[in-house]
Structure formats: C-alpha cells, structure tokens
C-alpha cells in the first residue's frame, strides 16, 4: 500500500510498532539464518505475493517444495492428506471416508461461496460428513481454534481454507507443494522497504501510534516522539488497535459495529531441537486433551542445514486473550507443552531443546460468523481521509500474506481515487 502511494509521488510515512518490519512475518535468527516468528508459507494460488516478489527482484528466491501433513488423533500419529493415507486412516470407516472426501471435494471445487455464508460450519459438517468425522477430525480442530465460539463460525470460513489448500495440490492429489523464500520472507519485506524508501517514503520503527486526532481538516498522528501532521491516514492494524487510536473520531454506529467483531489471539512457541519430533511438516492435533492445536516442523519442509543443523518446531496455539496460558511466561507455557510433546513422540526429552522462543499475537484469526459479509468494516471510515486496512476485511478467503498484499493494493487504489477526486495536489498520507 505504502509503495503504491509513494510511487505516485505522495509523501508517505509508516509508523511501525515493532523493531523490525513485517508484523506477523517479522523474523528472529536461528543458526545465523532469518526465520519467521510465526510460521509462513505460500500456496500455489497466491499470485499477488508471487507477483510482488517478481516486481521487487526477489522472485528467484521462491522455492516450491513438497510438504507432508499428518494428524494426531486417538492417541497416535497418522499420515493424512493424500488418498492413500486416507485409505489407511483407521479411525474412520469406509462410509465416513467417502463422505469426508465428497464433502471436501465439493468445497474445493465450488466457486459459489455465497451458499455457505449463512450456514453453520458445525451443522454443515455434521450433516454432510457425519458425527464420527466431526468428532474425529473437525470438532477438536474447531474447538481448539475458536473455543466456545466454534458453534458461531460460518461454513464460508472453512470453504476459504479448503479451497485455497486444494489449489496447491498436485493434479494426482498425492501431495501439496508450498512456497517459501530462501532466506525467509524477510527478503521480500526488506526489498519492499528499500523500494518504498527509494520512492521517497519513510519507515519509522519501534514507534507505535498512540492516538489520531483531527483538527481543522488535518490529522495529527500522535506517537511517543510527538504529533505528526497528515492529510490522510491509513490504519493498517487490527480492529482493536483501530478502535483504541481512532475510535473517538468515528461515527457511534460504526464504532459499535467494530466492537462487535471478534478474533482469537495466538501464541507461537518456536523450539530449536537437536533432532526431529515427527516425520511431518504440518501436524494437526485433533485431540481436546492436548494443550495446543498444531505442530509445524519447519525443517521437515526446508532443509535444516540452513539453520546450522537445527530442527525447528513451531507449536501453534489459538486462544482468546482471557485464557490463562495467554499471559503465562515462556517457561510456564513450555512446561505445559512438554508432556504433550512426549505423547506425540515418547522418546522426546527436554534435553532435545537447544533454544526456545515465544511470541504473542493479540489478533490472529477473525471469527467469521454467519452473515459476516454484512459486518465487514469499510476501508473508508466515517471520517473523511481516515482509512482502515485490516485482517477483518479479508473475505471470503482466509487471512494470509497473499491477501494482505491484495487488500493493501486495494486500499492504495481507494486512497488514490479519493485524492484525485478531491483534487489534492501533494497530500501526505501516513499509514500506521
């Protein structure tokens, strides 16, 4: 978004909360190699991300590699995600498997998502796939991700996820190829930052916005370093942050609609191990007794020699901010995870852990409820010159890096259209 505005000659200043740019794609270092704090990959259908990488001269760094999916259920690991693995998946009987496959294919090949907007995901799955499939596969995953809001989730959300994943499968359906950038997606972010600054834009790191004020038709973006004037402001932040810094400017009805939106938070623990935990890249945990929802073993997808031989394991856990584990220390969280990791691999021992890292995201997954389209906040707010570009607007697709780019471009076009329509000669939009 900032790049598109700067390319048109507008003065752009970005206020970034974190010491490094990238948001959920920010990085740490493991074995001297950058690594995302939260696991990231691309699907083959993520055309916007691929196009941006090509535009910025880093497209040759993208690698498309096979990945392997598994599931933990009924106390053991199962290969899961290919026709052969499904045939061998004993927790479901042949009729269950057939219903599961037919329903999944319907979602992957149906383009008309509108039919799922006002349908409960829980009810649809139970009706089309049966109670055993719900209880064995989907139920634990939904409840781990959405807790007591699982019953509120619309089927269109699952349609978006399965349709996206289906497009990354080989024609035979025997595997999924995912995209990763050699040197991490920090290479894409660094290239984007360089292009923005070359176009005259400015990026200010570790400078969270505290408040946005508006006086006599101009904005003041207030940070710890002072008040910064702007003619237009784009808030590229989660809905709660938008409410906190700009809610007092909004129309009361618009503010109430924003307050009615909900999202789960997430904690992501990254372990550097001296050996592999499982044979899978992506392991869904379909067990309500387990304290996390997914194990993503990055080095079962990307060669571990890039990380000085270390095995990298992400432990994914979606929860709401009032969950006790969300405010727990890194050691407390890890302590609660260790017995579960030993269940997954009985040989696992704490001595396998060479280092650990712990990250929070207050706003990680919007809760897409029935009729969500009517709840989506507009990019143009009720305040002229104030815009919102956020995860909650991504629909019907699920959130991800590709759609952050798509919606950022969309917001930039909207701002540019308004500037041209209003005849502004030299505005200074300041995304934050």
Question: For each predicted feature, which ranges?
Answer:
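A short, Lys/Arg-enriched amphipathic alpha-helix followed by its capping loop at the start of a domain
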Residues: 1-10, 199
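Glycine-rich FAD pyrophosphate-binding loop
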Residues: 6-30
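Mid-domain catalytic core of redox enzymes
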Residues: 8, 207-313, 317-327, 331, ...
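Dinucleotide-binding Rossmann-like beta1-alpha1 core, especially the glycine-rich loop
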Residues: 31-114
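Feature captures the FAD/FMN-dependent oxidoreductase FAD-binding
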Residues: 48-64, 68-80, 128-134, 196-205, ...
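Active-site/ligand-binding neighborhood in enzyme catalytic cores
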Residues: 92, 101-212, 230
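FAD-binding beta-loop-beta segment adjacent to the flavin cofactor pocket
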Residues: 302-308, 361-388, 392-395
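A conserved FAD-binding loop/helix module that cradles the flavin
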Residues: 392-415
């Amino acid at each position: 978004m900032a790049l598109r505005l700067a390319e048109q000659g507008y003065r752009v200043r970005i206020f970034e909360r974190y010491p490094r740019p990238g948001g959920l794609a920010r990085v740490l270092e493991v074995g001297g190699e950058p690594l995302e704090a939260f696991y990231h990959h691309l699907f083959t259908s993520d055309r916007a991300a691929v196009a941006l990488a090509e535009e910025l001269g880093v497209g040759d760094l993208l690698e498309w590699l096979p990945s392997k999916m598994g599931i933990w259920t009924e106390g053991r690991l199962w290969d899961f995600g290919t026709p052969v693995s499904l045939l061998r998946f004993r927790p479901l009987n042949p009729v269950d498997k057939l219903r599961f496959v037919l329903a999944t294919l319907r979602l992957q090949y149906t383009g008309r998502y509108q039919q799922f907007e006002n349908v409960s995901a829980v009810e649809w799955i139970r009706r089309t796939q049966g109670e055993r499939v719900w209880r064995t596969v989907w139920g634990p995953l939904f409840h781990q991700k959405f807790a007591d809001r699982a019953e509120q989730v619309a089927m269109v959300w699952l349609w978006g996820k399965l349709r996206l994943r289906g497009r990354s499968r080989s024609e035979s359906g025997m595997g999924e190829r995912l995209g990763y950038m050699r040197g991490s997606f920090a290479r894409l972010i660094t290239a984007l930052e360089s292009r923005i600054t070359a176009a005259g834009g400015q990026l200010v790191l570790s400078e969270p916005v505290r408040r946005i004020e508006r006086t006599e038709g101009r904005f003041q973006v207030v940070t710890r370093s002072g008040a910064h004037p702007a003619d237009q402001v784009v808030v590229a932040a989660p809905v709660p942050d938008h409410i906190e810094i700009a809610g007092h400017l909004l129309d009361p009805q618009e503010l109430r609609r924003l307050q009615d939106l909900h999202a789960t938070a997430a904690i992501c623990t990254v372990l550097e191990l001296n050996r592999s935990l499982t044979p899978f890249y992506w392991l869904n945990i379909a067990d309500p007794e387990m304290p996390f929802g997914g194990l993503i073993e990055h080095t079962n997808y990307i060669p571990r020699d890039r990380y000085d031989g270390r095995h990298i394991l992400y432990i994914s856990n979606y929860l709401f901010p009032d969950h006790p584990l969300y405010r727990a220390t890194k050691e407390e969280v890890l302590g609660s995870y260790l017995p579960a990791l030993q269940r997954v691999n009985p040989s696992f021992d704490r001595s396998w852990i060479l280092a650990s890292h712990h990250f929070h995201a207050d706003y990680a997954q919007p809760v897409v409820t029935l009729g969500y389209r009517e709840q989506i906040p507009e990019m143009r707010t009720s305040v002229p010159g104030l815009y919102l570009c956020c995860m909650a607007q991504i629909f019907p697709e699920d959130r991800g890096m590709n759609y952050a780019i798509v919606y950022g471009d969309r917001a930039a076009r909207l701002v540019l259209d308004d500037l041209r329509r209003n005849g502004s000669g030299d505005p200074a939009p300041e995304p934050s």
